[in-house]
Amino acid sequence: YKMVEWNETLDLEEFYQEAERRGHRNNSNQKSMIDCFKNEDKWNAWILYKHEKAIGSVVAHTFPEMNGYRILARTCVLDGVRDGKGLGTGRRYIVEHQNLTSQYFVPTCIEWCGVDSDMYVTSNNEEAGSQRLVNKIYFPLLEKQGEFSKVKEINYRNTEQIVWKLNAHKFLENLRKYPCIK
């Protein structure tokens, strides 16, 4: 796996088409995945590649509502390309960080924001992507490990969202305990 910083020269047409086909509307074109963040004070996006094929995306940006950064925005890993079966495969894949989000997206966002920065993630109960699983399973399990904490509910970008704060040091400490997906 390889994380590549997004830039205008990347050919993501196949990725966008596959995201559209799978119903990931926020990752189905540059306008919805990238351009909507260009008005943020600071932002960056990355594409995850496996064998030179784009298989995932993530964005981080300033989050003035919380005086920090919002990470894991536009997170997408296309089904059928990861070794596990995703969030629904079991508690172990989450708490032992045996998923691409934990092993690639979160560390990349931490590196960009700075390990001591205030970093937040938002989740909701919408059907989009795997939001319900993220909201009901992923973050609550990581909260029990002290890696995230539920902060509050806000209306953000016209959607009711739960804000989770990342404890970057604890997350990285726990991540180092487990093997990396190759």
Where are these regions (language model features)?
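Conserved N-terminal entry element of GNAT/NAT acetyltransferase domains
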Residues: 1-10, 170-182
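Short amphipathic alpha-helix that is part of the acyltransferase structural core
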Residues: 1-32
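Active-site rim helix/loop that mediates acceptor-substrate recognition in acyltransferases
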Residues: 23-49
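Glycine-rich phosphate/pyrophosphate-binding loop shared by adenosine-nucleotide-utilizing enzymes
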Residues: 52-57, 70
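Conserved acetyl-CoA binding element of GNAT-fold acetyltransferases
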Residues: 67-80
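Conserved acetyl-CoA-binding loop-helix of GNAT-fold acetyltransferases
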Residues: 77, 83-109, 132, 136
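Conserved beta-strand-loop-alpha-helix junction that forms the acyl-donor binding cleft
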Residues: 110-135
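Conserved catalytic-core motifs of GNAT/GCN5-like acyltransferases
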Residues: 122, 140-163
